[in-house]
Swiss-Prot record:
Pathway: Quinol/quinone metabolism; 1,4-dihydroxy-2-naphthoate biosynthesis; 1,4-dihydroxy-2-naphthoate from chorismate: step 2/7; Quinol/quinone metabolism; menaquinone biosynthesis
Free-text comment on the cofactor: Binds 1 thiamine pyrophosphate per subunit.
Keyword Disulfide bond among record annotations: no
Cofactors (names): Mg(2+); Mn(2+); thiamine diphosphate
Enzyme class (EC, first level): transferase
Taxonomy of the source species: Bacteria, Pseudomonadati, Pseudomonadota, Gammaproteobacteria, Enterobacterales
Naturally occurring in which organism (per UniProt): Serratia proteamaculans (strain 568)
Protein name: 2-succinyl-5-enolpyruvyl-6-hydroxy-3-cyclohexene-1-carboxylate synthase
Membrane spanning stretches: none
Self-association state and partner proteins as the record states: Homodimer.
Keyword flag Transferase: yes
Top-level taxon: Bacteria
Length: 557
């Protein structure tokens, strides 16, 4: 038996089975043990192959591809710590629902727990974080091809959200051999190879049901909270809410156009709290809320019922309200639950929100820094493009200080909300859509994922990465951290600048010192055609202090 040839036969069937379930993008890291998988992916004309030398970044690249394409994406890595480096992206996918298929090559069983090189215990490596896991046996002709293909089919049919981990042990040799061998093993699947359907098709029994008392509830005083959703869903939800006459509080990721902008500011006002307390029903669409004041209100509100609607499974309400947890996409819900035109019941919230937006504009009119960037960000967005937001302070400033256009695509990693892999994820988002992309991250986030700048060299449309360099993790300036220890143990300033990083990866670079220069640099980036790194060096605590000042100003009104 030629082990190397049959390894490749086995891997080719495995990859073809994934292609039948909509996998188009395959992300590959270098490695020898994963050779059967890599060669099978390269030979399959259904796939677009992406490569990266860092498995942690590779996993996040796949995450970005899955976010923007809304399709399952496969990842191939070798054995050992290469597999462990996928953990952060796997965790994020589990929380935000992107479908990722992690194919981890492994040593065969006889090389585990005996001191063999690059051999770790990969079975169950990711604990409970994958939605599904398959531990494949060592490839052998004793196992029929129909077992392998139906095993993959069954798992992919059940993979509605999160990650599938397929551990793939391969024995040596991994190279060479007569490629014509073992054709009879593959041929047992007959004309399946000439089609494009799965071998085994399972029917999803999940069905969204119309709430029978919706006619009753839609006549009540309701509030809509909009979390993470698609651009189309955000637009339609805003129209639905307007027809109902219900106030809509939109998160930065809601893409609703935030009819009540600056919610993280005006929610600090007692007048707003009092009016919202009159709501009889709160309906939240999507999870992953960003603003502190919104999260506080969400926890403290006491309507008669609280409905949370999201296609993700599980409990998504940390406040544990009385009400209903309904698994549905926003689009499905709106189709089944039509709005009834009604007079708005909380018009004064519109006044409070508009006043908050005016207060922000007035406060920042002659200031240049990360707060002004957040407030005027819509001016920088590329036409027919998309926006990727980092975590920590910058996403909170954008959520609190501006109003993004309705239906404009916004992406972020707001599941576990880590600062790792953000540039890699943005690169994946760009590749999936081939749209002009604006990404905004902080300096520590950029340092954490610095080698992902290599991925931006291959962007298919103009891409601008703005690095807000406030010299450390200034999100901690918003928290009651011990002042004497804040810089050393929390903010951890690194005193770096990014021109050398841009030069290392052959990216265009600019460091504007005022708004006019920033606008010019961004516009040049859209004309440039490749990737541009724009570094915004700002006073360390200016953004945090601006947000605190504006919240205090709202509280006193």
């Amino acid at each position: 038996m030629s082990t190397s040839v049959f390894n490749r036969r086995w891997a080719a069937l495995l990859l073809e089975a994934l292609a039948r379930h909509g996998v188009r993008h395959v992300c590959i890291a270098p490695g020898s043990r994963s050779t059967p998988l890599t060669l099978a992916a390269a030979a399959n004309k259904s796939f677009i192959c992406h490569t990266h030398f860092d498995e942690r970044g590779l996993g996040h690249l796949a995450l970005g591809l899955a976010k923007a394409s809304r399709e399952p994406v496969a990842v191939i890595v070798t054995s050992g710590t290469a597999a462990a480096n996928l953990y952060p992206s796997l965790i994020e996918a589990g929380l935000t629902g992107e479908r990722l298929v992690f194919l981890t090559a492994d040593r065969p069983p006889e090389l585990i727990n005996c001191g063999a090189n690059q051999a770790i215990r990969q079975n169950g490596l990711y604990a409970s974080h994958p939605a599904l896991s398959i531990d494949l046996p060592r490839p052998t002709t004793d196992i029929p091809a129909r077992w392998l293909v139906s095993t993959v089919d069954s798992a992919m049919a059940r993979l509605q959200h999160g990650a599938l981990h397929i551990n793939c042990p391969f024995a040596e040799p991994l190279y060479g051999g007569d490629e014509q061998q073992y054709a009879d093993w593959s041929a047992t699947l007959g004309d399946w190879w000439q089609g494009n359907h799965p071998w085994l098709r399972e029917v999803d029994p999940h069905q969204v049901l119309k709430q029978p008392d919706w006619f009753f509830w839609r006549q009540k005083r309701g509030v809509i909270v909009a979390g993470r959703m698609s651009a189309d869903e955000g637009e339609h939800l805003a129209q639905w809410a307007e027809m109902l006459g219900w106030p809509l509080i939109g998160d930065v990721l809601s893409q609703t156009g935030q009819p009540l902008p600056c919610a993280d500011l005006w929610l600090a006002q007692p007048q707003a709290q009092k009016r919202l307390a009159e709501a009889q029903l709160v309906v939240q669409f999507g999870s992953s809320l960003t603003g502190k004041r919104l999260l506080q209100w969400q926890e403290q509100c006491q309507p008669q019922e609280y409905w949370l609607i999201d296609d993700l499974p599980g409990r998504l309400d940390p406040a544990h309200h009385r009400g209903r947890r309904i698994r549905s996409s926003v689009a499905q819900w709106l189709e089944l639950h039509p709005a009834q035109p009604r007079t708005p019941w909380a018009d004064e919230l519109t006044m409070l929100a508009d006043n908050a937006l005016d207060a922000v504009s007035g406060h920042l009119v002659n200031r240049f820094g990360e707060a002004q960037l957040a407030h005027r960000l819509p001016e920088l967005l590329p036409e027919n493009g998309q926006l990727f937001l980092g975590n920590s302070l910058i996403v909170r400033l954008i959520d609190a200080l501006t109003r993004l256009p309705a239906g404009y695509p916004v992406f972020s990693n707001r599941g576990a909300s880590g600062i790792d892999g953000l540039i890699s994820t943005a690169a994946g988002v760009q590749r999936a859509t081939a749209k002009p992309t604006l990404a905004v991250v902080g300096d520590l986030s950029a340092l954490y994922d610095l080698n992902a700048l290599a991925l931006l060299r291959q962007c298919s449309a103009p891409t601008v990465l703005i690095v807000v360099n406030n010299n450390g993790g200034q999100i901690f300036s918003l928290l009651p951290t011990p002042e004497e220890d804040r810089q050393r143990f929390y903010c951890m300033p690194q005193n770096v600048e990014f021109s050398h990083a841009a030069a290392m990866f052959q990216l265009a670079y600019a460091r504007p010192e005022n708004w006019g220069q920033l606008l010019q640099a961004v516009e040049q980036g859209w004309r440039h055609g490749g990737a541009t790194l724009i570094e915004l060096q700002v006073p360390p605590s200016d953004g945090a202090q601006t947000l605190q000042h504006l919240v205090q100003q709202m509280t006193e009104q």
